[in-house]
């Protein structure tokens, strides 16, 4: 028996990292799943891993910057399993590490589309099904950067702060329908996205700097974010709503800004 038996969940960005960990954890706990990712090869690999725990999985290539594709993933999942209990809006792209004065409008629009509009689409098209189901759980993945400044990441942090604010408003507005809405704000997690940021930084010290920012002396694991998502998706989290769950190794309570980040010009790199 799993804590998500008889529940149906949609999870985006399952090809790797946090989204993959959440989808696998949900499958182990008995959920039926609708999963999406823009990378069909990674999506296929995750789907095969999910099937080790359950055959109840609907897999669909999904570009979360497209409202039509997000809606299709949700609709197909409901058509297959008859209802929706949980939505996890997970996809993010890391663009930053330099001042916003060096950020192109194209980069800004990309961050908005993937990190914010995707969350809006997921919530917009899942809420009618959650209402019909007499309730459910919305889980939006934000970031610890919405809580503590890190030079060079103002655009990313601002949008993640917007995700938190929108989620709190959804919790208030749709609470009367027994719909809970929460965010999870991870610290630095061992994911492909973090690996990309470290590689693009080029100093060779960024990973060590990230570790020093966390009082626990390490970066986190995707499975540790997934464990929080399982709680919020389950009946154990039935009274949790409108909250931001920081899973950050204590970073926010002891903020340590990395010297020099954001002090360089992207155009001079």
Where are these predicted regions, by residue range?
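Conserved glycine-rich cofactor-binding loop
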Residues: 8, 15-17
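C-terminal substrate-recognition "lid" of short-chain dehydrogenase/reductases
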Residues: 120, 218-247, 252
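Active-site helix of classical SDR
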Residues: 123, 159, 167
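Substrate-binding pocket helix/loop in short-chain dehydrogenase/reductase
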Residues: 98-100, 107-112, 210
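Alpha-helical segment proximal to the catalytic Tyr-Lys
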Residues: 128, 172-176, 238
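Short C-terminal tail/terminal secondary-structure segment
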Residues: 97, 241-269
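Residue(s) in the substrate-gating loop at a strand-loop-helix junction
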Residues: 143
């Amino acid at each position: 028996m799993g804590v998500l038996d008889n529940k149906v969940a949609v999870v985006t960005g399952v090809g790797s990292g946090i989204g993959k960990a959440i989808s696998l954890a949900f499958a182990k706990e008995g959920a039926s799943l609708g999963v999406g990712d823009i990378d069909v090869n990674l999506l296929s690999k995750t789907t095969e891993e999910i099937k080790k725990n359950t055959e109840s999985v609907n897999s669909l290539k999904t570009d979360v910057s497209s409202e039509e594709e997000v809606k299709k993933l949700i609709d197909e999942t409901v058509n297959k399993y008859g209802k929706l209990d949980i939505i996890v809006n997970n996809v993010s792209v890391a663009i930053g590490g330099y001042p916003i004065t060096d950020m192109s409008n194209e980069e800004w629009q990309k961050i908005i589309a993937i990190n914010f509009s995707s969350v809006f689409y997921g919530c917009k098209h899942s809420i009618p099904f959650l209402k019909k189901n007499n309730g459910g759980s919305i889980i939006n993945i934000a970031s610890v950067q919405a809580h503590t400044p890190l030079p060079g990441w103002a655009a990313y942090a601002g949008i993640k702060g917007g995700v938190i604010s929108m989620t709190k408003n959804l919790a208030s507005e749709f609470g009367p329908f027994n719909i809970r809405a929460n965010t999870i704000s991870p610290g630095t997690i061992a994911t492909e996205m973090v690996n990309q940021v470290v590689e693009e930084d080029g100093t060779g010290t960024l990973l060590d700097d990230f570790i020093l920012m966390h009082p626990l002396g390490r970066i986190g694991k995707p499975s540790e974010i997934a464990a929080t998502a399982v709680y919020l998706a389950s009946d154990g989290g039935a009274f949790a709503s409108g909250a931001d769950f920081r899973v950050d190794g204590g970073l926010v309570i002891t903020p340590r800004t990395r010297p020099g980040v954001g002090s360089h010009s992207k155009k001079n790199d």
